[in-house]
Amino acid sequence: MDRQTLKHLQDIYSSILEIEEFLCDRPKEFATFCNDTLLRRGIERNIEIMGEAMNRILKTVPDIPITSARKIVDTRNFVIHAYDSLRPDILWSIVINNLPFLKQEIEILLKG
């Protein structure tokens, strides 16, 4: 894997770790997430970074073995362009249900 792709994978991994850090001292509850604007904005920003990094990866490695690669880019685009209709429950679901698996996939690629 080329150096630039590894850098983008590391950017995604760093964003995941940052989101985990945001949540480590807070209850992992949807209500807490909804009531904390700073937390939501921090998560949104990291999702934007992950989506942009994935978009750059897909341009050079279109068959990267990441299950939801295209959805990550689509989510980034939605967060940026449809910010006024972004539903907190969808964002929360991504954090709780999708990030742990994505983290595993990225770790495998970074170790390989």
Locate each region found by the language model:
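Solvent-exposed interaction patches of small proteins and small membrane subunits
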Residues: 1-112
